[in-house]
């Protein structure tokens, strides 16, 4: 099993399955794919991934969800797991939220709904390259 995972978080099941299916179609069985319909469920999945020894993963999270918004969630993620690559997805452009996540959560990319499959795959590919770059260029102390 891969030591890398891609977690998609969105309260709309059709969006969630569309994301997962498009990503899995392009990357096959090289990665573990997870979905969550809420921030609470996402935290459970993250805990499960950590227990399985998976530390390199990408989170694609919707911005507007019930309870905790995606920008707040990604900031919390970055505070606890700074190496996780974060991508925010939204149909409602909130430039202030995007900028806040860029500054506070090292946002890798922002995708507008509806997204193009090519752009989604390009964003995921570049996020995965960040893991490869970190592993091939270790910091010497």
Predicted regions located by residue number:
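Acidic, metal-coordinating helix/loop segments flanking the phosphotransfer/catalytic sites
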Residues: 35-58
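Short amphipathic alpha-helix used as the core "switch/output" element in two-component signaling
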Residues: 44, 71-83
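Receiver (REC) domain active-site loop signature in two-component systems and cognate sites
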Residues: 65
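Alpha4 helix (beta4-alpha4-beta5 surface) of REC/receiver domains from two-component response regulators
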Residues: 72, 93-110
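Hydrophobic/aromatic residues positioned on beta-strands within the core alpha/beta folds
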Residues: 89-90
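C-terminal output helix
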Residues: 115-126
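The C-terminal output helix
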Residues: 125-140
